[in-house]
Amino acid sequence: MTFTDWPWRHWRQVRSQAPALRLNDEVLSWRALCERIDVLAGGFAAQGVREGDGVLLRAGNQPRTLLAWLALMQCGARVLPVNPQLPQTLLEALVPKLTLRFALTLEGENAFSGLTALQIQKSTAAYAVAWQPQRLVSMTLTSGSTGLPKAAVHTCQAHLASAQGVLSLMPFGPQDDWLLSLPLFHVSGQGIMWRWLFAGARMTVRDKQPLEQMLAGCTHASLVPTQLWRLLANRAAVTLKAVLLGGAVIPVELTDQASKQGIRCWCGYGLTEFASTVCAKEADGSDDVGAPLPGREIRIVDNEVWLRAASMAEGYWRDGKLIPLVNDEGWFATRDRGELNHGRLTIAGRLDNLFFSGGEGIQPEEVERVINAHPLVQQAFVVPVEDKEFGHRPVAVVEYASQAGDVNLAEWVRDKLARFQQPVRWLTMPSELKNGGIKISRRALQQWVCENCKN
């Protein structure tokens, strides 16, 4: 589909009174949504926001976060969403390089002295710049797992290409409703928003509450396996029929249970630089992440995954300039180790993470996939610690589900991992490393483990 106007305005023309968005329990039609966006955009314009301006949006998921984002885009702004829990020291290091003029803080304190503070205010004068699909609209921080995060910059066209690829595989129609279950400061949350806008379906945004309550009336959701395990175990009365799973290995037992309750499950592989999902498939219990979606291309060069796609970012933003993502051959080298078999991609892990123990190569992600398959594990990481005899030994750091109790993971992995792969020590994830993001810094984790293993 090709849009000739902002997607929400397009759907106002096509199906004006159809339900578009549910904000807590308030349902807005496409016409009503456009009216909300117009007056908010007018308010931002009255405060000086103009086309091309960089705006920092510090907020978690809530109804006014989404409306503000759409209104800022309609002003032509380049939006940088940030996690309210990011340390101020990190933001102080990042912000000066990102050419920002304004900051809209909906959670936390507005501590950006060099940026003009914006307020949510309505204006009787609606405001909108012309639709240009190639305009830069978002700056999304990479995970920063190995250093200072970079800001990947996407156009509307790239986001829509990402959405189109996913929806070519996963049905999402006008009568469906996708819960905004992931944060908009993460590319996975943005992916939900753009799929909704591409499909002209419905999306639900609710203030934070138990997942079962947030899912009321929703047909689609993006979840991690632990969340789906919990829903099924609690025999929750949900209206779900489709789930996009991410963040861990997908046990076939989980998808079989979901299927018995009428829920189809998909999984895949994505990157911030590619506006979310690159490969996907309906979950089938195999280790691969599926085939490239339409508009995506994959090469394997020296065991490294190379990508290019219509959804690729224009570059990394630094000091008012776009730093190219691609190499001299026009491909993005991911630093992920993988292989293609019959057109389907299998990811082994990060090339940078491989280490050796007694001469045996250990790819942490392969061990993590096994540990993460345990239904009481929220997430797990494996890092090397120095050892005089073996060179390095694997240590596991685990975040358990709240109801886990005593879990003997060492015994559980004994027949699932080679002996050299089995962690020699099991540590519980410290709260200070969970800064509210979806990904945890491996560098910080490594430092923490080394300190604890000295004791």
From Swiss-Prot:
Keyword set for this entry?
ATP-binding, Ligase, Menaquinone biosynthesis, Nucleotide-binding
What does the record give as the reaction this protein catalyses? 2-succinylbenzoate + ATP + CoA = 2-succinylbenzoyl-CoA + AMP + diphosphate
Q: Does the keyword ATP-binding apply?
A: yes
Q: Which GO terms describe its molecular function?
A: ATP binding; o-succinylbenzoate-CoA ligase activity
Q: Which domain of life is it from?
A: Bacteria
Annotated InterPro entries: AMP-bd_C (IPR025110), AMP-bd_C_sf (IPR045851), AMP-binding_CS (IPR020845), AMP-dep_synth/lig_dom (IPR000873), ANL_N_sf (IPR042099), MenE (IPR010192)
One Pfam family assigned to this protein is AMP-binding_C
Supply the EC number(s). 6.2.1.26
Give the record's GO biological process terms. menaquinone biosynthetic process
| Disulfide bond annotation, renumbered to this chain | none
Its annotated pathway reads: Quinol/quinone metabolism; 1,4-dihydroxy-2-naphthoate biosynthesis; 1,4-dihydroxy-2-naphthoate from chorismate: step 5/7; Quinol/quinone metabolism; menaquinone biosynthesis
- PANTHER family, per this entry? ACYL-COA SYNTHETASE, MEDIUM-CHAIN ACYL-COA LIGASE ACSF2, MITOCHONDRIAL
Q: Which family does the UniProt entry place this protein in? A: Belongs to the ATP-dependent AMP-binding enzyme family. MenE subfamily.
What's its job? Converts 2-succinylbenzoate (OSB) to 2-succinylbenzoyl-CoA (OSB-CoA).
Fetch the HAMAP family from UniProt.
Answer: MenE
The protein in question is named: 2-succinylbenzoate--CoA ligase
By which gene is this protein encoded? menE
